Amino acid sequence: MDTFAALKSLSLAYGPPGREKEVRGLFKGYVNGLVDEVFEDTSGNLIVKRYGQHKGTVFFSAHMDEVCFLVSKVLPEGFLRLEGIGADVKLLPSQKVWIHTRSGKRLRGVIGMLAPHLQTEETRKKLNGFEDLFVDVSMSDFSEISVGDFVTYDNEPFSTGDFFFGKSLDDRACGVIIVKMLERLTALRHDFDVFAAFSSREEIGAFGARTAAYALQPDIGIALDVTHAIDTSPNYPKNEFGKGPVIAVGAIPHRKISNLLIETAKQNGIPYQIEPSPSRTGTDTDQIQLETVAAGVVSLPLRYMHTPYEQICVKDIDETARLLALFVSALKEGVV
Amino acid sequence: MFLKDLCEINGASGNEDRVRSYIQEQLKSPEEPGQVDVLGNLFFEKKGNGTSDKTILLMAHTDEVGLMVTNIQDDGLLAVSPIGGVDPRVLLGKRVWVGENNLPGVIGYKAIHLQKEDFKTLPDWDKVRVDIGAQKKEEAQKSVNLGDYVHFYSPFEEYENRYVGKALDDRAGCALLMALYRELPVLNHRVVFAFVVQEEIGLRGSGSTLKRYKPDAAIVVEGTTAGDNPELKRERWSTHLDNGPAISYLQSGYALDYRLFEAIVAFANQKGILYQLKGRTVGGTDGTRLASTYFGVPCAGVNIPSRYIHSPVSVISKKDFENTKQFIADILTEEILLKALEVKV
């Protein structure tokens, strides 16, 4: 798989929570030939299975959905009001968006901003909320737009050097890690059967991963998600780009799993970083663990999360896939 | 298409070379190669048929608002300052072009999850940073220099009724002048088409036009503020899209020549042309400079209403563009300005 090409297609794909069909289609294509079974469950997860020697089961999940907005009102003259899930309103002025109508059309819109000439002292100081922002859709026939239509960022992903910028890399870039891990597993012996879910609806509560874990009942379950890169908070380590996967240690990640991941990294000279996770991890793992599964979290450093241009380092994708493939191949019966 | 090409060329104030070259390439002929002055203004002259010694000047500015790299931080991020009027609120999460080689970059912003009190604070210039993927100052310095220009990344789009893109202020005016230069027949008087630099940082380019051509009257064509946003009451709008050319009567620093203004309005009424008067007096144009330089040239403003100018995405009406172009062509052909000036002040 061409990582850059896949990241670009995935970043551009439409897939708010519960509307992940386009993303599912892409992943279905990428796993072709790498797995023994592919199916879609009723929650909208894409589940794949690659069999080993049936000595145990290990499960990975990476979510397909993205942060998004919803049309809350259609005003005359082609203006819309919005509500949002998970995005920072401060970043919306002058942002281009796609409006996805229920009839299946994709229309363009522009979140307008009053020109500086017309600002007053008061409006210059105002922090815009959803009550102020509007989408100009006067450039399209907006008669089919209705309340409840989904709205997503319209922008163009790009790469520069080892870095890739675009929307929805949270968490589709981790889906790419799963595919690249499966590619590597074709050349490795593994006792454990490998299950993976490209999961749905994480951004509103990780429903997809929960139902997938319930259905598959794996021994080990590892969520692959993104974590904040270059967070300047003095209370946490700074996750850096190009320094490898971030392994979570803490309450929810099972100690044996975290340790085994760290051991595997050390033995194979894979750089890694540690993320302390005192309580909930905010990833699919919080749900996977509840199915009585030895859980883990491996994260990809990402900067500017939930914004139109999230940033990742492509080297980190490769290193994480390598770590996970070697981890899987090291799993022996009765490990947990 | 002139407008698409013009909007996609980067040219903030002081960096208009590429815009100027494009216009000159498109318009030049063996008879009129175009003239460039020392400031970077470009002029095309359409000679009259000899029956009149008068000159009418049409003017649009080639520059756009943008940013400049003012510091390269130790962490590889670039600090920027505005060139012209830019509201930092329109920059967050946007893609930009950095420097002469159009290096891609992003104005990133701290993830919502990591914000605390700053969630409720207004983003200012101290928070606007361009990320080009460099992790250290030395790395960034390999491809970026202090003083490099930063331009909005914004592919132009054409719709049935709208054009969407950056820099419609004032590439819409430039495209309109280019079309008129191509389409206008030879008139009795001379027409000078001026594409001038550095409007956005204080109307700095336009004055030199007067020394060179001594025009009798001028029309400045701007992509002018619309402000017909839902948050503004109708009476506070500046102009409204689809309502036709916007004629200005008073703007920052200049009450447009009343003889020209009245004549243009009377002409529009007589011909039954859909037009609007610009409802707000904010914003200056090169008309202010023309009227206050040397002998002071009587000046009119006929503009294309534009939404969200000075941001990465502005919007104009296709109909307004065409109607404004036709209206100005008719004003020139029927010598409305010259007739108006025969009346003594």
Where do the model's predicted regions map?
Chain A
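N-terminal hydrophobic/helix-forming segments and targeting peptides
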Residues: M1-V336
